[in-house]
């Protein structure tokens, strides 16, 4: 059995920044540091931060007064920001800047009284945060659609004053079809020049397609609640390549690789490389050889830290 590695894979700039914000807050201010929602959707990362004093909560009502709170990479609604400000909580915002870009678009449509359609998965924290950027005070509304069937049944108030945005971690292929359906149903709809799916999601989806084309089975390292990791598994399966989403080496079953010659490994944007290395080691213990990385797109994007953490970390 031969191992092939997707390139790029694993952490993106937004995840790197979010984790580093929690790390630096712990270093500068000491525990406990409260984090609203899992800072990124990865069990290993969350448990590591929890062991060092991060406390993860789902709502601000679980947070005591006079503590530091960090908003997760997925972003939060305006109502959550207002609640935090009203309580005087000290907040560091780990929202991915590419998610913030979508928030700004939604807020602008709201101010203009333009209705908005969000393409995304119901219940995902990024979707909840983005929906919560829209203020209906000007008479508009925001709608959520997941697929073409949702578009077909959608009724809006004013189809002549309508725009769309997308969740950043969707399947590019699926999203393209939904956008086509929106443009066909609502010819006057506006939106970004391209969808809002982020560079890291696009690059990892392109890489897993190459991996699935060259391999007999694909392993996606990522947690079950990670949207972008699930999309990678689905893409491989659509190419008729068996694919498994695993948190780490302990989730693998040796029988998956009976008769397999080439094993492909990738990782979602919130999965650390140490987990990939663990998977490789286990496969090699089962007789796999090599760990060749495919040619891919280089990523050199970085996002800046909040100023207070950036300055204090140098003292």
From Swiss-Prot:
Pathway entry: Isoprenoid biosynthesis; dimethylallyl diphosphate biosynthesis; dimethylallyl diphosphate from (2E)-4-hydroxy-3-methylbutenyl diphosphate: step 1/1; Isoprenoid biosynthesis; isopentenyl diphosphate biosynthesis via DXP pathway; isopentenyl diphosphate from 1-deoxy-D-xylulose 5-phosphate: step 6/6
Keyword Oxidoreductase among UniProt keywords: yes
InterPro entries xref list: LytB/IspH
Cofactor needs: [4Fe-4S] cluster
Co-factor note (free text): Binds 1 [4Fe-4S] cluster per subunit.
Enzyme class: oxidoreductase
Reactions that this protein is recorded to catalyse: isopentenyl diphosphate + 2 oxidized [2Fe-2S]-[ferredoxin] + H2O = (2E)-4-hydroxy-3-methylbut-2-enyl diphosphate + 2 reduced [2Fe-2S]-[ferredoxin] + 2 H(+); dimethylallyl diphosphate + 2 oxidized [2Fe-2S]-[ferredoxin] + H2O = (2E)-4-hydroxy-3-methylbut-2-enyl diphosphate + 2 reduced [2Fe-2S]-[ferredoxin] + 2 H(+)
Protein residues bound to isopentenyl diphosphate: 41, 74, 124, 226-228, 270
Keywords: 4Fe-4S, Iron, Iron-sulfur, Isoprene biosynthesis, Metal-binding, Oxidoreductase
UniProt: (2E)-4-hydroxy-3-methylbut-2-enyl diphosphate binding residues: 41, 74, 124, 168, 226-228, 270
Pfam families with a match to the protein in the record: LYTB (PF02401)
EC code(s) of this entry: 1.17.7.4
An example molecular function term from Gene Ontology annotations: 4 iron, 4 sulfur cluster binding
Positions contributing to [4Fe-4S] cluster binding: 12, 96, 198
Any single GO BP term: isopentenyl diphosphate biosynthetic process, methylerythritol 4-phosphate pathway
UniProt binding sites for dimethylallyl diphosphate: 41, 74, 124, 226-228, 270
Keyword Signal assigned: no
Active site: 126 (proton donor)
Role noted for this protein: Catalyzes the conversion of 1-hydroxy-2-methyl-2-(E)-butenyl 4-diphosphate (HMBPP) into a mixture of isopentenyl diphosphate (IPP) and dimethylallyl diphosphate (DMAPP). Acts in the terminal step of the DOXP/MEP pathway for isoprenoid precursor biosynthesis.
NCBIfam families on file: ispH_lytB, PRK01045.1-2, PRK01045.1-4
Family per record: Belongs to the IspH family.
Name assigned to this protein: 4-hydroxy-3-methylbut-2-enyl diphosphate reductase
Lineage, broadest ranks: Bacteria, Pseudomonadati, Pseudomonadota, Gammaproteobacteria, Pseudomonadales
Gene responsible for this protein: ispH
